[in-house]
């Protein structure tokens, strides 16, 4: 179910303050956050935000195409290593 329009997009307050503070600076700094549920807003475009996936921070460069998505979508938490190989092929 989508979020109500009257509520607006969710973004953590501390993350929003960091985004506003870094948007005025010429030097781009990487913003670290644990908030995977925060929505990407237009003010974040051209910033690099490191999102925590439970083990490490994954840097995400924000472009216009990512606006409206959640930060957690671009920081996978699980690693697929492939299915177990069966030994039945060689046996007969």
UniProtKB/Swiss-Prot annotation:
InterPro entries linked: Ribosomal_uS19, Ribosomal_uS19_bac-type, Ribosomal_uS19_CS, Ribosomal_uS19_SF
Entry annotated with the keyword Ribonucleoprotein: yes
Function recorded in the entry: Protein S19 forms a complex with S13 that binds strongly to the 16S ribosomal RNA.
A GO term for molecular function: structural constituent of ribosome
Matching Gene3D superfamilies: 30s Ribosomal Protein S19, Chain A
A matching Pfam family: Ribosomal_S19
Protein name, as recorded: Small ribosomal subunit protein uS19
Gene designation: rpsS
GO cellular component terms attached to this protein's record: cytoplasm; small ribosomal subunit
Record flagged with keyword rRNA-binding: yes
Lineage, broadest ranks: Bacteria, Pseudomonadati, Spirochaetota, Spirochaetia, Spirochaetales
Homology family: Belongs to the universal ribosomal protein uS19 family.
PROSITE patterns for the chain: RIBOSOMAL_S19
PANTHER family reported in the protein's UniProt record: RIBOSOMAL PROTEIN S19P FAMILY MEMBER, SMALL RIBOSOMAL SUBUNIT PROTEIN US19M
Gene Ontology terms: biological process: ribosomal small subunit assembly; translation
SUPFAM superfamilies: Ribosomal protein S19
Keywords: Ribonucleoprotein, Ribosomal protein, RNA-binding, rRNA-binding
């Amino acid at each position: 179910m989508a979020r109500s329009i009257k509520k607006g997009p969710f973004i953590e307050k501390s993350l929003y303050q960091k985004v506003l503070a870094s948007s005025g600076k010429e030097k781009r700094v990487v913003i670290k956050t644990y908030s995977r549920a925060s929505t990407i807003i237009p003010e974040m475009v051209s910033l690099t935000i490191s999102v925590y996936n439970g083990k490490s921070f994954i840097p995400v460069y924000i472009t216009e195409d990512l606006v409206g998505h959640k930060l957690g979508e671009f920081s996978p938490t699980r690693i697929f290593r492939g299915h177990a190989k069966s030994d039945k092929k060689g046996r007969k």
